[in-house]
């Protein structure tokens, strides 16, 4: 039973890391659509030009990954805190999307991932 718990714990941790990386990649790619002359971004959910607030709203609306630690909830949510299994995204200012992810219960500093994405 202990080995199984270790396996599921590692799977949840790795799934959370993957969701974080995919979120950063998706938001970055969607913001680039505006730079390339598209009129909409975030899966046609938001109008160009891209702002941090539009990117946050669009990501929350279009990304449906589940929190590996609490599958009743989505992993991508608007917020500023570290919540286990959650990718918290916020507009830190008009041109920067801040991303915070906690990969393991307890959210120790070693278990925190952060990123910043510019809309410019």
Regions from the PLM with identified roles:
Residues 22-28:
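Oxyanion-binding/catalytic loops of NTP- or PPi-dependent enzymes
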Residues 1-22:
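Amphipathic alpha-helical segments typified by the pilin-like N-terminal helix
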Residues 29-120:
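Periplasmic/extracellular, small/polar-rich flexible segments of pilin-like filament-forming proteins
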């Amino acid at each position: 039973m202990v080995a199984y718990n270790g396996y599921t714990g590692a799977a949840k941790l790795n799934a959370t890391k993957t969701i974080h990386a995919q979120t950063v990649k998706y938001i970055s790619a969607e913001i680039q659509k505006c730079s390339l002359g598209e009129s909409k971004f975030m899966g046609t959910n938001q109008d160009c030009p891209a702002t941090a607030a539009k990117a946050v709203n669009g990501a929350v609306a279009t990304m449906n990954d589940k929190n590996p630690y609490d599958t009743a909830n989505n992993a991508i949510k608007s917020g500023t805190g570290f919540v286990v299994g959650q990718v918290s995204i916020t507009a830190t200012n008009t041109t920067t999307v801040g991303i915070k992810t906690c990969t393991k219960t307890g959210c120790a500093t070693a278990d925190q991932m952060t990123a910043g994405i510019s809309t410019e």
